[in-house]
Amino acid sequence: MESAPSTRVLLVEDNEVFREALELMLGIVPDVEVVGAVGDGLAAVHACAKLRPDVVLMDYRLPELDGVEATAAIRECSDAAVVALTATADDAELDALYDAGAVACLTKDSSLEEIVGAIRSASSRGASLV
């Protein structure tokens, strides 16, 4: 029996320790494949074009382009769904991320199960998640 294809994920996080921890945690999830990990918004746009992920897990505060700018740029040139990851769940930040094209927004203290659930939902192109 052939297994279902993995969801290809690009991680965008400027905190190297957090980025590596996310990569390690997602690496144990059988149906998720981390295809790249970058530390700034501009690198995210370039990596998205090159790696063609299904889902981009996007930090809000980033160098070069912030998460809102990078999300908007990715949505203009890619079908990848963007799941935003933010340290604070400020209403203005959330509105800006959704307006830019994010399909879900999570806080950085979300559990692995919550993050994986959002990735799976985003990859199936479901309705926006709250």
Located regions from the model:
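Active-site residues of response regulator receiver
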Residues: 59, 86
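C-terminal output helix
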Residues: 92, 110-123, 127
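Conserved acidic carboxylate
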Residues: 13
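The feature encodes the CheY-like receiver
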Residues: 63
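Acidic catalytic/metal-coordinating carboxylates
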Residues: 40-43, 66-69
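Conserved phosphotransfer cores of two-component systems
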Residues: 49-51, 73-80, 100
